[in-house]
């Protein structure tokens, strides 16, 4: 916990950022223990935490060396949970993990290796030593310590004359080779895309590492196998060194990405518990790190271990979350007509993301739609429906303009390739700023009909990603509002012309760097002023994370004056529950991702905003985010009702009772907000 003294004001209390993130992941683990999620989904959640640990290790360890103990402890908890769930699956299906095999089973193991493992068993060429540049952060390998066949003790006499040899023999001195040859070498084989568990016809379960160890003589024919196991390397993410330049070619930017991914030093190396100390020392020497960077775990790469070949023996159907039903008040071929008559709000994943695809598809096929504008941050793949439709639109002769953010962490390489694909199809690529990320999510169809210009606009709180839309809770807002459409188009024009992003604002749509912070502070100023007239004031916030000290100080200031804050935050949270501040975290089956801000003055004022920005410094100070006031009464009421429903959840919720201390909310009469939202959006009875 940190205190920040500011003149005569009371000391401001903040939760440590890293402790907050560790706490969030522990909330997920606690929620899994109390949940009725299908067991395979519990495995998926464990893999999500594993990825979160990787991110912490790559980003935060450099500034906080003491964090390693907490990460290792959390990683061990996750491994234990994952293995417990995995063994429960095996037990319920009469399967057993085995280390002994008869002759027929050994033949089957060899067949599994040849057909399922070997095709993707990519061995790094280390004839001249380990090629560290070929090992990217997060890659999972089977590392084998092999006896070097070139090492022949006391035989390599090159460099000695006969007189020297005679003298050394007379004095019983060891004759060592003049040319240094290592006794052992390390062999790395990438296994990221290979299942970690397999089912034999006899019902036995065998691990990938067990197969390799049993068949080591068959696999490593040139050098004798001594020791081996699973290994994963997490490197420091030197994000400040990754200066991608939109003006450079894709090839040159990709070189920068690969350099960042492959040349930074390891912050954490995970290895199997069975790997011996000699192999650890050789790993440390090879990677030029201390042995304390290398840690043993029961399950290395939990997120990659989720790739399981169980021959579809497990039924993971669930009655509450079956096939999603799309918004059904329109003909999908006449979606634009529906939006022309009324604003539309979709709540994902409870309502299908296909509607967003259909919206773009109709724009591509509608002859009256002359131009398409879209932002791209994280899509599902280079071959996603979104990318295909944008290419199709350009090939059909439409004016397609796409802003692809090449600095999206982890997606830099794919986004650079997407730019090439779109460019080849004739899409106009709007280049982003070198030092500012564009995180806004917008899609506009410009229609020219009967000599009139119309705009159909989609704004979302989440990415244009068909895969994550199935598990992320987000809003899609569609409108025919001409003024709003013009202001969103202005954002694209401003970015395309590289005008000053700090002065780009509209009446309905704001997108400049710092605009979200400015709007929040102005709204809080109004609430503070209303308090002076003894009017009840309330601010409701729903975000993914809160870590900006200035905005937290501003919230503390209003809370001490009497503004009531109702905050729902999923992950990182440095704010404390002082008087007038209630903080709740929702950890459900779906990942809460929407950002909502509401400001109320009792009886006379009620402003509601949707945004792409969390209360994180990166969102508030270093990104172009979008924020829009919802004015349509029907949609506004729907979002307000959704916000209120989070207060009643006693199934997924944790309250922060004291600074950094969270308590799970339980009840004999469980209310699950996500099940309620699913039923509400699909016209199902909640009982």
Regions found by a protein language model. Name each.
Residues 1-539, 557, 561, 571-687:
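N-terminal localization/anchoring segments of enzymes in phospholipid and broader phosphate metabolism
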Residues 549-552:
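Glycine/threonine-rich ATP-lid/beta-loop region of ATP-binding domains
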Residues 568:
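The conserved SAM/SAH-binding core of class I Rossmann-like methyltransferase domains
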